[in-house]
């Protein structure tokens, strides 16, 4: 029996080696694709091509008796690696005549990411940090674009301190709140103004499929090429007004981050044994715990800035606190029917999204369980 099992495992090892060779060949082809895309200014990520390819492979897998979900999982991971590989090949310069780009706060993580992407796209990039302010006027004197990438709590102050910029210079900010910085830029500069909010962390290996929110400030025709450049990097663009952006971010960022902070604080005050929690956890709780831990591995100043960026955020968090208290009253009263009625009400509000989110989360939970050690 042992000999038979060993022989079968040896065959599996040979198949795995063949898979490795095929993956290496695929990455070589991806590198060639990256060079062609770079030459012609084509975006890294083309959703129609990806969807068509996955649909074809799923059908072919089913015909071979291979679970379609398996080949999709494998291909999605391979494509993620492919997008990163294409990144390294550089990108077409969509605005060759652009004068130097100055990134204010370019030493920070997001600033470094934009420096990398702009450099890969053939633009000259300069960095303006705190210790450079005595030379700021010289650094920005001939700038074609100035990108402000500094902590939220000093963004408007830094914008106000900028020396006069060339009239055609594009002034951009990357803050995760938009209305205040956008208004500050419109006051500080008479030329083109653009507000951006990258909806991802600076540790992303690629901008493929990442969302970049943009808010029009002034003279969109002057910065249209830059939006197209970001699309070439693989990102999805979403336009919204600065006011609407901040209203949505109150839910997406401020409330979510505060709830995560409060839960982490509660765990610490209760002094629970994390190792035991992990050992006993279901995939969904492990994933939730990972999201909580991830928050506390990052810069507390950033999250304090996001959560405390407006009175509206505080008002929203207070309403959440009030509803939390109302939910606790149901428990105190032991009113299961009221709980079920509230549950059904929320289920109805989610509508078809509930089933969609269940399907999406199922994939995430399987991946989380696969990574369990």
Swiss-Prot record:
Any one Gene Ontology MF annotation carried by this entry is: NAD+ binding
Domain (Prephenate/arogenate dehydrogenase) ranges: 99-361
User: Major location, coarse class?
Assistant: cytoplasm
Q: Which reaction does it catalyse?
A: chorismate = prephenate; prephenate + NAD(+) = 3-(4-hydroxyphenyl)pyruvate + CO2 + NADH
Every copy of the Chorismate mutase domain together lies at: 1-90
What's one GO BP annotation on this UniProt entry? L-phenylalanine biosynthetic process
Please give an example of a GO cellular component term from this record.
cytoplasm
Pfam families, alphabetically? CM_2, PDH_C, PDH_N
Query: InterPro entries attached here?
Result: 6-PGluconate_DH-like_C_sf, Chor_mut/prephenate_DH_T, Chorismate_II_sf, CM_dom_sf, CM_II_prokaryot, CM_T, NAD(P)-bd_dom_sf, PDH_C
**Alphabetic keyword roster:** Amino-acid biosynthesis, Aromatic amino acid biosynthesis, Cytoplasm, Isomerase, Multifunctional enzyme, NAD, Oxidoreductase, Tyrosine biosynthesis
Q: Where in the cell is it found?
A: Cytoplasm
Pathway linked to the protein: Amino-acid biosynthesis; L-tyrosine biosynthesis; (4-hydroxyphenyl)pyruvate from prephenate (NAD(+) route): step 1/1; Metabolic intermediate biosynthesis; prephenate biosynthesis; prephenate from chorismate: step 1/1
> What NCBIfam families does the entry give?
CM_T (TIGR01799), PRK11199.1 (NF008400)
**Membership in a protein family:** In the C-terminal section; belongs to the prephenate/arogenate dehydrogenase family.
Q: What is this protein called?
A: T-protein
Species in which this protein is naturally found: Escherichia coli (strain K12)
